[in-house]
Amino acid sequence: MVSLKIQKRLAASVMKCGKGKVWLDPNESGDISMANSRQNIRKLVKDGFIIRKPTKIHSRSRARALNEAKRKGRHSGYGKRKGTREARLPTKILWMRRMRVLRRFLSKYRESKKIDRHMYHDMYMKVKGNVFKNKRVLMESIHKMKAEKAREKTLADQFEAKRIKNKASRERKFARREERLAQGPGGGETTTPAGAPQQPEVTKKKSKK
């Protein structure tokens, strides 16, 4: 049996694959053994005496089905677990994921002008302090705080309007009082028309007893 190691190596180099992928025609071993250059190997490849084997297909359908089932929670009982809970999913990773989700949510709300920078900072510090369990709780807290601020603003506006109204009422009352004081205790001086005769003053005599 003629050794075809050199021809297989040259064919692998020409076809840019591994030596395991090279198929040499056993019926043409004599012609193949005479090929000692890359040019001769290319000619044999063109003639079909040397062939590159097709890639073996390793089906992943079973692996995909298993991964889909694991996403649904199957195959994850006590008998399938290896390692402690902390080793399987560290609490630090869970914390980082939650922080990133909540902070991204706050940034999106701030950019869309749904919250101002003061509320953003307040909520950011609460997120850091582990106040909110998930995004839904954070959203409810934001809506509640906005409703509370709106209610406080409405009450403040009502109080300010009432204060202005009372102030105006006091000013009107004070103006009327000043006007009455300016007119005098008799309700104002009575003026006699020019040219009218003045009535003499009548003095009452005291009777002696």
Curated annotation (Swiss-Prot):
InterPro entries: 60S_ribosomal_eL19_sf, Ribosomal_eL19, Ribosomal_eL19_CS, Ribosomal_eL19_dom, Ribosomal_eL19_dom1, Ribosomal_eL19_euk. One of its GO terms (molecular function) is structural constituent of ribosome. Residues 60-84, 161-209 are annotated as: Disordered. Residues 71-83 have a biased composition (Basic residues). One of its GO terms (biological process) is translation. Residues 161-181 have a biased composition (Basic and acidic residues). It comes from the Eukaryota. Keywords: Ribonucleoprotein, Ribosomal protein. The keyword Ribonucleoprotein applies. SUPFAM superfamilies: Ribosomal protein L19 (L19e) (SSF48140). Pfam families: Ribosomal_L19e, Ribosomal_L19e_C. GO terms for cellular component: cytosol; cytosolic large ribosomal subunit. Belongs to the eukaryotic ribosomal protein eL19 family. This is Large ribosomal subunit protein eL19z. It comes from Arabidopsis thaliana (Mouse-ear cress).
